[in-house]
């Protein structure tokens, strides 16, 4: 996590708490010549366009007051969607029995990417049920080897 995203999280977390929204993720990226501050929010039952607009307005107010980002940027507040990132311990626990996609820093059993059903989670590992050809198997992945994890839509 970058210093900017850490600062932004610290600034906007109280605002989102007051609105009863969960802060899912903050990203600050440059695309071409433009900078984007992307904030993903959620709440019980999901967020709609009005929730995103309200959060955007309140985040904008506090960001303008605190001004932690020197560059001009576009603020984008959205729901995390069906392929929500899995980052926090709570996210991993909530994903048990659900389809997930995991990208690794280094290959395990010849692959850096795994798609399957999350079976269990502990402090050091996750266990996924994955399909390989026509067979189903369980694979144990050390959590410190996970670059990114997210919910997946399996068809």
From Swiss-Prot:
Pfam families hit by this protein: DUF150_C (PF17384), RimP_N (PF02576)
CDD domains: YlxS_C (cd01734)
Localisation: Cytoplasm
Disulfide topology: none
Origin superkingdom: Bacteria
GO terms for cellular component: cytosol
Keywords: Cytoplasm, Ribosome biogenesis
Reported function: Required for maturation of 30S ribosomal subunits.
Family: Belongs to the RimP family.
Protein name in the entry: Ribosome maturation factor RimP
């Amino acid at each position: 996590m970058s210093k900017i995203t850490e600062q932004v999280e610290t600034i906007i977390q109280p605002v989102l708490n007051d609105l009863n929204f969960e802060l899912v993720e903050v990203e600050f990226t440059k695309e071409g010549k433009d900078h984007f501050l992307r904030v993903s929010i959620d709440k019980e039952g999901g967020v709609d366009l009005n929730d995103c607009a309200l959060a955007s307005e309140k985040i904008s107010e506090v960001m303008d007051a605190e001004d932690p980002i020197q560059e001009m940027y576009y603020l984008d507040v959205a729901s995390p969607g069906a392929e929500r990132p899995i980052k926090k311990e709570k996210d991993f626990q909530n994903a048990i029995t659900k389809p997930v996609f995991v990208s690794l820093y280094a290959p395990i059993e010849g692959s850096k990417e795994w798609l399957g059903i999350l079976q269990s989670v502990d402090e050091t590992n996750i266990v996924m049920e994955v399909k390989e050809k026509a067979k189903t198997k369980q694979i144990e992945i050390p959590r410190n080897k996970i670059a990114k994890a997210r919910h997946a839509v399996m068809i």
